[in-house]
């Protein structure tokens, strides 16, 4: 256990990406750019140990995956989809009917094409399809393309069923940096897209960083993380599994628990130690807990909030007797979960907001994925002659001050 100042003194995040990967990523991207599908099939065999004669999964296969899915899973995916869709519709930026007197305003248009990366390494993630493709669908994106790593037994039925529910246009079995390159450049089979979203490993993250500018991206994702503020009213057995749930994603997953009550932290530590040997996915969870788990004793409310805002975690959970004051004070988090019945895991699947959230302190300056990330925003300036005449002198004078005389002349010629 550390006090807040001790934690802050030692707190630092390693660079989210391993710079030594740069030449590997560059070579993969160049290979895909030059050799297209041939390179993708080679990398499927090299990295995923899977021979893929056909990169695209047919619409018939996608529909069959949904049709033959067990009813309980189908209903769960459908409920998640409906909640995500309803929430995203409620926050979507829309074009407003404006009075004729309004001379400057904004209009929104959906992106034409989007690529979605769905991880497929240590687990199957139909939830990622729902938390990304639904947003693109609500935005009105014309062409939604999913890429996901090939598996020896094929792409998981649940992932394909989620693609069917969200009306994804095409699904390709290709993963890693090579899939990001394919979506950026286009190949004989995979279409070039305008933007790529979705979480992935370091190779995926670095490829997105490397190719940004040639294609839009959502973020450079690092290891997943959660920070919780708790007091003596929190259910510590539930907190144990809030911590384990995050830790089971990745050995590098980070978990932080903050409390003003040192005894609560000691009790929690004891329960984690007791439960750990029997936890599912022990190899992953135990490494995360051993290396990336922190118990932090805060001296007061402001101290706890300061620590939380410094961490700027992907997920923040407040489980205290009176969580309301934290809603305004905790400013820099990907998503804020309030109360005993709002565990972070519910946000992973069915709450409504996307689970694609900023990591590695990037919540200090960016936000979680939303429907509005699939829209362009254009400003429209349509001035009347009267308005032009009211402001033209100021504009042409500023142009003169900046010695941009053609700018100035563009205005003067209209005044004459």
Curated annotation (Swiss-Prot):
This is Histidinol dehydrogenase. GO terms for molecular function: histidinol dehydrogenase activity; NAD binding; zinc ion binding. Belongs to the histidinol dehydrogenase family. PROSITE patterns: HISOL_DEHYDROGENASE. It catalyses: L-histidinol + 2 NAD(+) + H2O = L-histidine + 2 NADH + 3 H(+). Catalyzes the sequential NAD-dependent oxidations of L-histidinol to L-histidinaldehyde and then to L-histidine. The keyword Oxidoreductase applies. Its cofactor is Zn(2+). Binds 1 zinc ion per subunit. GO terms for cellular component: cytosol. NAD(+) binds at residues 117, 178, 201. Gene3D superfamilies: 1.20.5.1300, Nitrogenase molybdenum iron protein domain. HAMAP family: HisD (MF_01024). Substrate binds at residues 224, 246, 249, 315, 348, 402, 407. CDD domains: Histidinol_dh. Pathway: Amino-acid biosynthesis; L-histidine biosynthesis; L-histidine from 5-phospho-alpha-D-ribose 1-diphosphate: step 9/9. One of its GO terms (biological process) is L-histidine biosynthetic process. InterPro entries: Ald_DH/histidinol_DH, Histidinol_DH_CS, Histidinol_DH_monofunct, Hstdl_DH. The active site is at 314 (proton acceptor), 315 (proton acceptor). Disulfide bonds: none annotated. Keywords: Amino-acid biosynthesis, Histidine biosynthesis, Metal-binding, NAD, Oxidoreductase, Zinc. It is an enzyme of class 1 (oxidoreductase). SUPFAM superfamilies: ALDH-like (SSF53720).
């Amino acid at each position: 256990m550390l006090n807040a100042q001790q934690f802050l003194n030692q707190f630092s995040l390693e660079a989210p990406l391993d710079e030594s990967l740069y030449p590997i990523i560059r070579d993969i991207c160049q290979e895909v750019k030059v050799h297209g599908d041939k390179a993708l099939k080679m990398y499927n065999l090299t990295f995923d140990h899977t021979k893929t004669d056909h990169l695209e999964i047919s619409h018939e296969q996608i529909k069959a995956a949904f049709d033959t899915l067990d009813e309980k899973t189908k209903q769960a995916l459908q409920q998640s989809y409906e909640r995500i869709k309803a929430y995203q519709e409620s926050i979507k930026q829309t074009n407003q009917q404006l009075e004729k007197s309004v001379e400057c305003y904004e209009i929104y248009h959906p992106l034409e094409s989007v690529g979605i990366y769905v991880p497929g390494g240590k687990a199957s993630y139909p939830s990622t399809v729902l938390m990304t493709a639904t947003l693109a669908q609500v935005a009105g994106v014309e062409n939604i393309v999913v890429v996901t790593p090939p598996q020896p037994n094929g792409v998981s039925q649940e992932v394909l069923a989620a693609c069917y529910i969200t009306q994804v246009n095409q699904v390709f079995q290709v993963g890693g940096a090579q899939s990001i390159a394919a979506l950026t450049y286009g190949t004989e089979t995979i279409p070039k897209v305008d933007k790529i979203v979705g979480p992935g490993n370091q190779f995926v993250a670095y490829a997105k960083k490397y190719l940004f500018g040639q294609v839009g991206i959502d973020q450079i994702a690092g290891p997943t993380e959660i920070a919780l503020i708790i007091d003596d009213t929190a259910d510590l057995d539930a907190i144990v599994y809030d911590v384990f749930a995050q830790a089971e994603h990745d050995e590098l997953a980070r978990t932080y628990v903050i409390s003003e009550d040192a005894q609560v932290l000691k009790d929690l530590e004891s329960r984690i130690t007791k439960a750990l040997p029997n936890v599912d996915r022990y190899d992953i969870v135990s490494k995360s807990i051993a290396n990336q788990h922190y118990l932090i004793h805060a001296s007061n409310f402001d101290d706890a909030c300061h620590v939380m805002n410094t961490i700027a975690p992907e997920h923040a959970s407040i489980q205290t007797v009176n969580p309301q004051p934290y809603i305004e004070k905790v400013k820099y988090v990907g998503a804020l979960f309030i109360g005993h019945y709002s565990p972070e895991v519910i946000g992973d699947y069915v709450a409504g907001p996307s689970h694609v959230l900023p990591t590695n302190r990037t919540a200090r300056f960016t936000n979680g994925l939303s429907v509005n990330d699939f829209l362009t925003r254009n400003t429209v300036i349509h001035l009347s002659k009267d308005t032009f005449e009211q402001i033209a002198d100021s504009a042409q004078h500023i142009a003169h001050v900046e010695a941009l005389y053609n700018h100035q002349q563009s205005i003067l010629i209209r005044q004459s």
